[in-house]
Amino acid sequence: MNTLQLIFLLFFFPTLLFLYCLPYKRNQNHRRLPPSPPSFPIIGHLHHLGPLIHQSFHALSTRYGSLIHLRLGSVPCVVVSTPDLAKDFLKTNELAFSSRKHSLAIDHITYGVAFAFAPYGTYWKFIKKLFTVELLGTQNLSHFLPIRTHEIRELLRTLMVKSRAKERVNLTEELLKLTNNVISQMMMSIRCSGTNSEADEAKNLVREVTKIFGQFNVSDFIWFCKNIDLQGFKKRYEGTHRRYDALLERIIMGREENRRRGKIKDGEGKDFLDMLLDVLEDGKAEIKITRDHIKALILDFLTAGTDTTAIAIEWALVELINNPNALEKARQEIDQVIGDERLVQESDTPNLPYIQAIIKEALRLHPPIPMLIRKSTENVIVQGYDIPAGTLLFVNIWSIGRNPQCWETPLEFKPHRFLDGGDLKSSLDIKGHNFQLLPFGTGRRGCPGVNLAMRELSVVIANLIQCFDWDVVGERLLNTDERAGLTAPRAVDFVCVPLERGNTLKILGSN
């Protein structure tokens, strides 16, 4: 901060304080806002928040109610912590809350045209259709099945080598490598090699982008700090953007050269980059896109499909290790349905209801993205309260998953609650129709990759259960603390010694 900026803050602070509070108090007198904790001028309720914001919101909700109004600096917000309220906001008033929160970092890194943050409209609808029908349609998911199968086999072989050498493995990193390779090959036909390949560089950049998106930037919340880079945040996200742009430009130029030389075949099985280049080169396309759109859309998918899936797999394994009875039931189901002569395949997973229940229970307790964030585009009234346009909505799905009014013994890992005879029926899905379980969101803004994610989760978890035990080096229970950020991974990496089960070599050799 330079001297002039410091003088500005010191000598004009009282004036800013007065000007800031006056209109806010006047507006409040004419609105019926939800309950709110005590606040301070300028910072509002920011002092109530710790590093794990979803947990801070949960604590506030237990004290002030399931619908609360907050002012984060100069940004009005509401926090929702029950399924009924989530339904009121996300379904009954879906169009009013169809926009997403933006930030200085998000707008810069994503070229201002990211699908994930685009307003609901023609462009958003076109890209959503491209995602769901073309890239993630049943035909294309089947086309990419060999890629998913190969990457899972590579993971299992890596773990088998570590097992025989009795060496520790960082399973957190191995799962990230797996999910990144699957997504990178679907996007751009590249994979991590461990030798500074383009895919390795992309993986590292995606992790950096995810960290940036999840970090608090005072310039996004205190209006008079907007042009003051107090945290050095701007320099960081601009540098990340430059590196990502240079990487994608190299990849796109290489692909364009291959297309000119006729090395890319027409027809089925194109990756997403080819699909986007087809749109770019099509003069009659419904929507005109640029190279910046292509780069932003690829980043959308890389960030959405890499960390989240790996985090979900890791949490499921951690809970199974901490709950050995559930782990044993899962193995019994695999033995009965599949046997011990071959690996579980994607086509088997619908016949493994306990594995599906494990996934639902892990996503209930540990949603990889703990909150759904929307922004209102118009004034609305919800349950008698005024919600002004421009209000940020936080639906705390982490809190909903721990709500004792929704779940019996909510802090316990009990997969059987999702089976017939449990607390809930197995028909309770995770695709956004049941508002007590929303790990993939709901409605128009629901995750378009839910089918791919569930295929990966099911087969990877089943294969890891089938082939290995885990020596966590003397720990009785694995740590379940979370790390702060846009996502909610474990606070510490999952490092263990994989223990090969009796028939692992035979099973791997037969596949």
Swiss-Prot record:
Protein name stated in the entry: Cytochrome P450 93B2
Binding site for heme: 447
Compartment(s) where it occurs, according to its Swiss-Prot or TrEMBL record: Membrane
Spans through the membrane: 4-24
EC number from the UniProt entry: 1.14.19.76
Domain of life (superkingdom): Eukaryota
UniProt KW keywords: Flavonoid biosynthesis, Heme, Iron, Membrane, Metal-binding, Monooxygenase, Oxidoreductase, Transmembrane, Transmembrane helix
Keyword DNA-binding listed: no
Gene: CYP93B2
Main location: membrane
Cellular component terms per the entry's GO annotation: membrane
Molecular function in Gene Ontology: heme binding; iron ion binding; monooxygenase activity; oxidoreductase activity, acting on paired donors, with oxidation of a pair of donors resulting in the reduction of molecular oxygen to two molecules of water
Native source species: Gerbera hybrida (Daisy)
Signal sequence range: none
Membrane topology, as annotated: Single-pass membrane protein
Family according to the record: Belongs to the cytochrome P450 family.
Reaction catalysis annotation: a flavanone + reduced [NADPH--hemoprotein reductase] + O2 = a flavone + oxidized [NADPH--hemoprotein reductase] + 2 H2O + H(+)
Family matches, as InterPro entries: Cyt_P450 (IPR001128), Cyt_P450_CS (IPR017972), Cyt_P450_E_grp-I (IPR002401), Cyt_P450_sf (IPR036396)
Keyword check for Oxidoreductase: yes
Cofactor: heme
Pfam families noted in UniProt: p450 (PF00067)
Reported function: Functions as a flavone synthase II (FNSII) that catalyzes the direct conversion of flavanones to flavones. In vitro, can convert liquiritigenin, naringenin and eriodictyol to 7,4'-dihydroxyflavone, apigenin and luteolin, respectively.
Biological processes per GO annotation: flavone biosynthetic process
CDD domains, alphabetized: CYP93
Pathway(s) where this gene product acts: Secondary metabolite biosynthesis; flavonoid biosynthesis
